[in-house]
């Protein structure tokens, strides 16, 4: 049904629209000025006052509004009832309570925060803020007060009607606002639908008639032959006239083309129907024409010479592009070009006509434009084809992605995304610079080096899926050839796509497994896989290159060997531990010549030797298997080290101890001396049963070795060959019926004594620990290097038994009941031997330091030595006692106790308080014995002297000891008030070019003694007679220097002498200073 302008239907529609617009305008005026914006925008759809083409009839029809009818309708109907609101109503008491609580909180918060304001802020600002708060709170209470007063003035207290009225206003206002904003949104969304020049007449024609009324000039195009027939009062164009015009156009086009420069790609053309047809194979066919010779060529039609599937792909692009064209050409856009490929012909026509009109070489410029357009379109068609393959095709499982760059006119494709072998496949599609054609390039170095394997493809638009299949097939061939070159796989003669890998089923048999490559995903998979093969298939697919894949397959082979050995040992009663994982692999005989060990995943290790090539480094793998029997000691295992290569597999057997500490497995002991190496093919059930019966004795021997290692005692087990060939001393191996019942271990003396070197010069460096299982005895054999004082003294408390066949050899013996506590017996042996070590060392040191005829050992016990070394000390049987304090493991302390009658007893506090080596103590006692002997003589002489004449003058002598290096003798006369101090120091003196320790004797603090002092003559006499060491000017035979002091030298204000000279020099000084002052003055 169609309506015309000015019809009754059109006027009725306009009247209804006018009434609605007036009602909408009245409502918007009640809502305020803020809602007028959207209402004004609705006038954009009305008739334009400035449009000159708007007719008076149209304006009259648009302005007809029956206002009276609308007013009568509104007054006749009663107003509707207001909807009653019963929700969100709060009582007045609750409102007052909430407002009061809010006010108190605001005041309290202000008082708290006002204290922390800035100090330099004036008080007026604080008062103003407080006043503003008070006014705000007062306003809230006033609003509530006004509301209460107002409600009381309403009749019948029906103030709820006001609430319902307010709710109705808000709802109505919201509806109007929603309508206004919806109209505004419609205007904004219809921006592209507006004409540049508003033509309301034509718009109304299209709206009412469906098409504009264009002039036809009384002609109607038709193919009817009778030109005289009239159709709707219009004459038809004669057919003859049409044919003649076409012939004239053919001639005109021929002449015009003959005068133009035709590029080589456009040489294929023909002229018919008044047009010239240029055809470029596999690209396009364009039709051009002209009006006369003076007019340029113009566009008529264009066809793209692609296949049907590609054309259907491009149709989506051209349809989307055609929507952006001019509105007046929408009807033409829907037409087809004859090959079911919709194009944006109006846009192309405009561009092509502009090129033909403005270009100096129009046909060349036209070809360049269309050629680039076709290449771009073909590239986009390839992009659409990839989208189709990735979304719904065979590559829909995320095995292929591509990146389309329209600016660079390239497509980058990556396939085999889930596979990592030889990185991800890469393909680049773009325009080749030399040929300016669309090509596909396969970026693969191996394919570039290979012969008869293409990497560049042309004509890709119609065959993109086939090209991808060929590239993936060739890529799989390259990977297979690289793997076959490593001599790990074998090629299947029946199926060239299959790789065969040999896996052991038993120790002596192998079976092949088949490995293939999925051409779509690029992943490896096994045919008829087991759970183990499925697990390794995922590892193989994570391999970065052929080297890593070959190593993973070697790990698969090693795991299969482990499974075979584990099954064999478990079937014969052994238990295999699968939870033990050590940090470092067992160092085998394969990797003892400077090889490196590289840890891999799942506790596997790649072992690289110096003799292996780089390609074989990662193909030599090691795995350690820990097995044991149920009755074995705890933590002891038989360790099988399986070393697998491409062609063979060897197994090394060792005994070790593995302990779990803090959740980590630690290898505490490992036997590397008796390693058994066998090939995998030689392991049988019979040999495993024999191993069960012969390995227990080795376990016990290694337990003893481990106990010694825990004590950090270096040891070496003596093999049965050494015992049988009698390479050991005869007294060690005698007394045993068979060598199977004894174990002999060589121990190092220094490590047995925890690093002490005290007996290196006394005992032999090696000892022998002999365990007799039949008699349950353990002995420790040792031997003196030379005849010492200890050999002459038999000490029963040390439990030392000397060997009759060897006078210098002895042994310590204990009986045991449990080999698990053998450490306790070794501790006892160590304690006794340490006592012997210290005792022997002390005796040897005493004989060395006290080399005199007066030295004599009085008593010798395990923990005590008493000896005499002074010449004239006969008051006691001993001069010194050495006590050795021990604990359960070692020597705790060694103390030196001087006897009370010993002149050196004065230094006992220094020996007790200072921790000095007993070697130093012995040397010190010997060096200072003559000094203290002289001091004892001086003290005894002064203490036993009595003055019978009753003289009041007597000299007192005191001995002082500051430390072990400085002594003093004080001569003091209380009657005369004189005090003379002699200092004796131990000093290192350079004498005859070498350092030597001597006694330095000199006066101390002589500044207070003047020439008038009574003590000055005695000091002067000592300086001239003793310190000067010059007796010529003294002239008296008593002052001649003693012969024992011939080595004394002058040193500063005193004299330095040896221990042998200290006594005569001190006695000479004492003879001078012991005289009373009154006797010396007289």
UniProtKB/Swiss-Prot annotation:
Residues 321-340 have a biased composition (Low complexity). The keyword Phosphoprotein applies. The modification N-acetylthreonine is found at residue 2. The modification Phosphoserine is found at residue 7. The keyword Phosphoprotein applies. It holds the Pfam family Med14. One of its GO terms (molecular function) is RNA polymerase II-specific DNA-binding transcription factor binding. GO terms for biological process: negative regulation of transcription by RNA polymerase II; positive regulation of transcription by RNA polymerase II; positive regulation of transcription elongation by RNA polymerase II; positive regulation of transcription initiation by RNA polymerase II; regulation of transcription by RNA polymerase II; RNA polymerase II preinitiation complex assembly. One of its GO terms (cellular component) is nucleus. Belongs to the Mediator complex subunit 14 family. This is Mediator of RNA polymerase II transcription subunit 14. It comes from Saccharomyces cerevisiae (strain ATCC 204508 / S288c). The gene is RGR1.
